[in-house]
């Protein structure tokens, strides 16, 4: 195009294309104090550089790095609908740090990816403040991230999230389930709600039942129960691991109880869970009744009140329960490990 064809016209800018660099800079300034509160030993350089640096502690003799990545799923659609963005950041952190925790890893640092069509600084800052809160609960550093403003890629007011956690475990202390044997005890730690899984079904139930999400629900608004942030189990379980032998752990996420517990079991074993060992929390009772959801479907979609499973030897069970209760966790003995019969499922709820 010749210079004369644009005479008298202002040149185009990135802002004209839908990307506001100034808003991105303002967001970085807003979130730096949040990230600073998460800093821990090992962080050499955090937010602002091209790459974040982390020095692994010399306390490890044979360190093994453990990584995990996840998102928040369609729980975000409810966040948009309700215009509340204060809990999904913690959800994002929890999904990854709880995953790497089950192998005995201490989460060291976390990075986030926030993508949107048009950047709303207040919304993004609220989300990232929640991410920082989750990192504090997990004891890991929010060491970096990416904010991607991509015009026309997302509807106005919507965004997507992804998170990445890296932790470390001593090689000889990796928890992989290989020592699990028949007779071991299955403990269940309470969830805070539906956590971050099954929300496509939650949203469908809401669509069909048309409840008042601001109505009182056992002392809180129904929307508060539905949007409760995912519980982070890192500190109490790292403490337990240092106290007694933990044979296996399972983070109860997508797939519920019946599809996550088998992921840590030897092929010749099955976990038999007693459905009356813990009370089904009110939120799940409501979801089941409003959606007329079958028991088996509940167990393979939702955590049903159990956010983390811990497997220990029978002789260690009572001590483990006392330790976790002292750390503030609600915990129950919910089942046992048995020898697996031919053709039997690896986890059954009876």
UniProtKB/Swiss-Prot annotation:
Keyword presence, Nucleotide-binding? yes
What is the top EC class of this enzyme, as a single word? ligase
Family statement: Belongs to the AIR synthase family.
Please provide the record's keywords in A-Z order: ATP-binding, Cytoplasm, Ligase, Nucleotide-binding, Purine biosynthesis
Q: Which GO terms describe its cellular component?
A: cytosol
Q: Name one GO molecular function term.
A: ATP binding
**Annotated NCBIfam families:** purM (TIGR00878)
Instruction: Report which reactions are catalysed by this protein.
Output: 2-formamido-N(1)-(5-O-phospho-beta-D-ribosyl)acetamidine + ATP = 5-amino-1-(5-phospho-beta-D-ribosyl)imidazole + ADP + phosphate + H(+)
Domain of life per record: Bacteria
Per the UniProt record, the source organism is: Cupriavidus pinatubonensis (strain JMP 134 / LMG 1197) (Cupriavidus necator (strain JMP 134))
A Gene Ontology biological process term? adenine biosynthetic process
Annotated signal peptide: none
Which Pfam families does the entry mention? AIRS (PF00586), AIRS_C (PF02769)
HAMAP family the UniProt entry points to: AIRS
Pathway listed for it is: Purine metabolism; IMP biosynthesis via de novo pathway; 5-amino-1-(5-phospho-D-ribosyl)imidazole from N(2)-formyl-N(1)-(5-phospho-D-ribosyl)glycinamide: step 2/2
Keyword Iron part of the UniProt annotation: no
Its annotated compartments are: Cytoplasm
Query: Any idea what this protein is called?
Result: Phosphoribosylformylglycinamidine cyclo-ligase
Which Enzyme Commission numbers does its entry carry?
A: 6.3.3.1
């Amino acid at each position: 195009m010749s210079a004369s064809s644009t005479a008298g016209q202002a040149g185009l800018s990135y802002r004209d294309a839908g990307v506001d660099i100034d808003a991105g800079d303002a967001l970085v300034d807003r979130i730096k104090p949040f990230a600073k509160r998460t800093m821990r030993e090992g962080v050499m350089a955090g937010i602002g550089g091209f790459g974040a640096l982390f020095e692994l502690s010399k306390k490890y003799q044979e360190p093994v790095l453990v990584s995990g990545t996840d998102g928040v799923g369609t729980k975000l659609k409810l966040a948009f609908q309700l215009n509340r963005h204060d809990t999904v950041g913690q959800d994002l952190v929890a999904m990854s740090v709880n995953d790497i925790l089950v192998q005995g890893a201490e989460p060291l640092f976390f990075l986030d990816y926030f993508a949107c069509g048009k950047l709303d600084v207040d919304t993004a800052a609220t989300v990232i403040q929640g991410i920082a809160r989750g990192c504090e609960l997990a004891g890991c550093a929010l060491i970096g991230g990416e904010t991607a403003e991509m015009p026309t890629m997302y509807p106005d007011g919507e965004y997507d999230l992804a998170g990445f956690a890296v932790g470390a475990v001593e090689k000889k202390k990796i928890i992989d389930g290989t020592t699990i044997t028949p007779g071991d005890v299955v403990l269940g730690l309470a969830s805070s709600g539906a956590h971050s899984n099954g929300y496509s079904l939650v949203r469908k139930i809401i669509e069909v039942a048309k409840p008042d999400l601001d109505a009182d629900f056992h002392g809180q608004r129904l929307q508060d129960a539905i949007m409760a942030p995912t519980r982070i189990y890192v500190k109490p379980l790292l403490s337990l691991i240092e106290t007694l032998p933990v044979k296996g752990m399972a983070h109860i996420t997508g797939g519920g109880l019946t599809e996550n517990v088998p992921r840590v079991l030897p092929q010749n074993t099955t976990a038999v869970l007693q459905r009356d060992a813990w009370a089904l929390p009110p939120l799940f009772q409501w979801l089941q009744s409003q959606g007329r959801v079958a028991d088996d479907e509940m167990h393979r979609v939702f955590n049903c009140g159990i956010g983390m499973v811990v497997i220990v030897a029978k002789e260690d069970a009572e001590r483990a329960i006392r330790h976790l209760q002292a750390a503030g966790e609600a915990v129950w003995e919910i089942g046992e490990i048995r020898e697996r019969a031919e053709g039997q499922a690896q986890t059954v709820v009876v």
